[in-house]
Amino acid sequence: MKLRKRLDLLMENKIKELRYAIVQSVPVMLGYLFLGFAFGLMLNDAGYGFWWAFFISLFVYAGSMQFVLVTLLTAGASLWYTLIMTLFVNGRHMFYGLSFVEKFKKIGATYPYMIFSLTDETFSLLCDLKVPEGMREGRVSFYISLLDQCYWILGSCVGALAGSMLPINTTGIDFSMTALFTVIVVNQWMDTKEHKPAVIGGAAGILCLILLGADAFLLPALTITAIILLGVKKKCYIPSES
């Protein structure tokens, strides 16, 4: 009887944590469903259908790089060129991981997935995450990460299906990722009094864009920004499972 009660209590807590994670991930859900839809449309327009959208979103799950990947697939780019381009486009994720790697290790078996699923939007949610008393923040963090990827996969698959059945003009859809990043920056700016990271990042980006051009500025700009901000106290915290 005691074991049954403990199991029931454990299941009840997990359900509460999942519900809380769903609520917290709603902003990302709205963005990912639309952006995933846009990616699915572009992928189908390039000649790759539903299953391509599903497996790319399942195993690649790289947001902006997936939009670039459509162009690379169409152009028949080599594997090495794709790897280099991925480093330039999504190299920023390495810097995200630096502030979470030790915390993720303490979460447990979900550690590898937490590293894999750390996108821009998930990173933003986990940085600001505060859970009610009695909930395990590590588990809520896992649920948020998993839900975010599910939103992206769903949007991608629906977009690919819609593109195969409806005559949709995809001109300008690739700008949707840029629009999302802009909204995130504006929201972060309004929600905090500390604007130094945004100013430093913006200045580094503009400088590298002028010096290196649009095709090669991103990774150097991120490197410069990370070096300057290394001494800044990090406010992101994800406790271990307990």
Which ranges hold each PLM region?
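Alpha-helical transmembrane segments and their membrane-interface exit regions
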Residues: 61-64, 88-95, 180-186, 205-207, ...
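Juxtamembrane membrane-interface segments at transmembrane alpha-helix termini
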Residues: 66-72, 95-100, 186-191, 209-218, ...
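Pore-lining transmembrane helices
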Residues: 20-115, 128-129, 151, 217
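Short, Lys/Arg-rich, polar N-terminal cytosolic tail immediately upstream
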Residues: 1-20
